[in-house]
Amino acid sequence: MVSFTVSVPATTANIGPGFDCLGAALGLYNHVTVTDPTDPEVDLLIEARGRDGEKISTTKDNLLYQAIAYFYQQTGQAIPPLKLEIDLEIPLARGLGSSATAIVGGLLAANQAAGNPCTTSEILQMAIAMEGHPDNVAPALLGGCQLAVKNGDHWQLVALDWPSKFVPVLAIPNFELSTEAARAVLPHQYDRSAAIFNASHLALLVQAFSQGRGDWLALALQDQIHQPYRQSLIPAYDQLHQAALAAGAYNLVISGAGPTLLAIADEVRAPQIASTLVETWHDAGIEAESHCLPIDTKGATITKLR
C-alpha cells in the first residue's frame, strides 16, 4: 500500500439560522497518516499526538477507525492491516467539527487504501449517514461554505460565497461541551413563528454573503431554533455577545454545538474582537484562546508519501 496523509479542516456549523444544514471549513486541520504496520502480526496500530491526543482512543472504537470499518462494510471488502498516525490541531468537543474530521478522514483514508472505488458524492453520503447531519461533514470534505438541502434520501450541496472581508473570529474556551448535551436542551417542537423567522434569516444570510453586505449579515445571523436554548450552557454568553458587538463585530453566534463562539467581523476590527472575547471570558473566570481563521476552500486533501 502506498503511504499517504489525509488532512481535514475544522468546521463551524449552523452559523446562526442554518441549524443542521449550513457550515463552513476553517484553516485549522487534523491529519492522519496511513501506512502498513511493520509487524506482520499486527492488524491495527493507532498513534495519536497533538492537541488532546491523550484523549484519543487507540483501539478499534476510535471514531476514525470506525469510519474506515464502515467504508469497508459498505463496499464489501476486507479491512487491510493499517497503521494510523493521527496528528491533531483541532480541540475536541468544542464545536469545531472534530468528529467530522475523524469521519471524513477515515472514509477518505479507506477509499484511498482501497484504490478509490467511491466518488466524492458517495463518500459524502456515507459521512452524513455516520454523523447524522451534514453541516460539519460537508464543508470538511468539500471546503468553503456549504448549504445542505435534503432531496429524498440524499443531500444536495450548494456552495455559498463567503467574502474574504468577512473574517471568522473563533473564541475557544478551555471546557468541553458534548453535542449530545447541547441537543438535549432543544425543544422537540417549535412555534410556526420560529420556523418563519429562521427561514427568512437564512435566506438573508445567503444574500449577505453573496453581496458582501455587512449590514444584512448583522441581522441575518439571528436565530430562534437553537441558540436561545444553548446560551445557558455557555457561561457569560450575554456579556460575550455584548462585548463582541461593542468591539465592532457584525454579530456573534455559537459555533456548532458550542462552547466555541464565532464572531464575524471586518479585517480591521477582527484582531481586537479576538482579544476582547478572551478578556471577557477571563473576567468570568474562564480561560480561552481566540483565532482569526481563514475560510478553507480546498476541503479534505490527500498527500501521497511514497
UniProtKB/Swiss-Prot annotation:
It comes from the Bacteria. PROSITE patterns: GHMP_KINASES_ATP. ATP binds at P91, L92, A93, R94, G95, L96, G97, S98, S99, A100, T101. Its EC number is 2.7.1.39. GO terms for molecular function: ATP binding; homoserine kinase activity. Belongs to the GHMP kinase family. Homoserine kinase subfamily. Catalyzes the ATP-dependent phosphorylation of L-homoserine to L-homoserine phosphate. This is Homoserine kinase. It comes from Synechocystis sp. (strain ATCC 27184 / PCC 6803 / Kazusa). The gene is thrB.
